[in-house]
Amino acid sequence: MATADKMEAGRQANRLRSALSDAVMRIAAKVGKAQGRLRPADIARKAVGDFVTKVDLRSEQQLRRELTKLQPQAGFLGEETEVAGLDNDWLWVVDPIDGTSNFARGLPHFAVSAALLFRGQPVLAAIHCAPEDALYTAVHGMGAWRNRRRIEAPRGRFDDGAILGCQWFRGQQDMRFLTQLQSKGARIRTLGSTVVQLADVVRGRLDGNVQQQGRLWDFAAAGLVAVEAGLRFTNWHGQPVFP
């Protein structure tokens, strides 16, 4: 009976992964078409160096409607709109456009990201990375996929040829840390999207990604993809971000 229950749970997870994938791809298609039609009036500043567009807002609203239908008992946390049900066991965490500044300037490095958490642990994820027009998905304990094919991350290199993605580094202390990395031969890349950079680590285009800070919607989905692809995803003390 336990085996049958496990098989049924796996089938349900794959059905939900497929539905989430379809929702993210629909949003990604609309976001891609909208990029070339942005006007200055469509872009607003939230804070220094932080922007939001009308496309962000529309995309998050549509994702909220679709994901709520998939898992009605789940709360919702998005970057751009009000939150709901944060105390629920289940929680959708969404970033409609990770890399909005790139998107607003016509640059290709942005992504659509959505994850379903159960009691704080990501269990389902889907991200669409615009630079490669690729869909990444993951299910906790079942693996990761790229364009619906299983993917395992290659082993990164950490010698003097390592190429590392970096995000959210500011201030003198952060700059000293980056200088230390570079003194050991690492080459630094900042693409402006945590999701895109983590996907590049999964693909082996980057050997790792480090960042000083981030919000849950920045890494919930991409972090699960990375872990299910065989990578370590830790805090500064080497502890798993999601135990």
Give names to the regions the model predicted:
Residues P154-P243:
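An extended, acidic
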Residues L57, E80, P96-G99, A130, ...:
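Generic detector of well-ordered alpha-helical packing
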Residues R39-A44, A144, K184-L191:
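Short secondary-structure junctions
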Residues I27, V31-Q35, D56, L67, ...:
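Residue-level signal for inorganic ion chemistry
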Residues G75, L124, D207-G208:
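Short, Asp-centered acidic motifs that coordinate Mg2+ and/or phosphate
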Residues R146-A153:
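A structural micro-motif at secondary-structure boundaries
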Residues M1-I97:
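N-terminal subdomain of lithium-sensitive/metallo-dependent phosphomonoesterases centered on the IMPase/IPPase/PAP
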Residues L86-W145:
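DPxDG-like acidic metal-binding loop motif
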